[in-house]
Amino acid sequence: MRVAIIDYGSGNLRSATKAFERAAREAGIAAEIDLTDRPERVATADRIVLPGVGAYADCRRGLAVVEGMEEALTEAVEKTGRPFFGICVGMQLMSSRGLEKTVTKGFGWIAGDVVGMTPEDPSLKIPQIGWNTLDLKRPHPLFDGIPTGENGLHAYFVHSYHLAAERAEDVVAEAGYGGPVTAFVARDNKAGSQFHPEKSQALGLALISNFLRWKP
């Protein structure tokens, strides 16, 4: 199995690659973790990971300038049905639009816009930086065996925006930060986390292992 982590100049690429390598090794899964900026490698991968940090529009633009990459993503994910995992802004790009600074069109895989967070408690700072627990809204294979809720494992967040999904069934998990914040979405063969699994220690490694086993 070959897992393509897309290198388009954004995301914690080194730490993401190492986290996927470690998760595969510890789970006893034979997987080649392929950090690549080559569309042909993405189009033929068994699983695809899209990291992303920074502004929505910048990440969208960065992906667009890699010739053939968006077409490769569409071929692998939409047409062939390969499992896809978006991380942070990589997850946000799954949305219809991003409303950060300007209106930017997303992939349209998860209906909804990426909007600024507005905590009810004014003492809560934006961005949210740090650890938070997850409220699982519905079962999903990527959370098999992972303790969630107040006494569950913690995930690591760094963000000022979140995906306001139009369909409740697309939201797998939320976090509380002065109100509900979308933490994980999934539809069909596509999944994405607002938090950083590569920085989320036990939760992150378990989530990645489940992704490597996932057969949507």
Swiss-Prot record:
It comes from the Bacteria. GO terms for molecular function: glutaminase activity; imidazoleglycerol-phosphate synthase activity; lyase activity. Its EC number is 4.3.2.10, 3.5.1.2. Pathway: Amino-acid biosynthesis; L-histidine biosynthesis; L-histidine from 5-phospho-alpha-D-ribose 1-diphosphate: step 5/9. It is found in: Cytoplasm. It catalyses: 5-[(5-phospho-1-deoxy-D-ribulos-1-ylimino)methylamino]-1-(5-phospho-beta-D-ribosyl)imidazole-4-carboxamide + L-glutamine = D-erythro-1-(imidazol-4-yl)glycerol 3-phosphate + 5-amino-1-(5-phospho-beta-D-ribosyl)imidazole-4-carboxamide + L-glutamate + H(+); L-glutamine + H2O = L-glutamate + NH4(+). Pfam families: GATase (PF00117). Keywords: Amino-acid biosynthesis, Cytoplasm, Glutamine amidotransferase, Histidine biosynthesis, Hydrolase, Lyase. The keyword Ion transport does not apply. One of its GO terms (cellular component) is cytoplasm. The active site is at C88, H196, E198. Coiled coil: none annotated. Residues 2-216 form the Glutamine amidotransferase type-1 domain. Its main location: cytoplasm. IGPS catalyzes the conversion of PRFAR and glutamine to IGP, AICAR and glutamate. The HisH subunit catalyzes the hydrolysis of glutamine to glutamate and ammonia as part of the synthesis of IGP and AICAR. The resulting ammonia molecule is channeled to the active site of HisF. This is Imidazole glycerol phosphate synthase subunit HisH. It comes from Rhizobium meliloti (strain 1021). The gene is hisH.
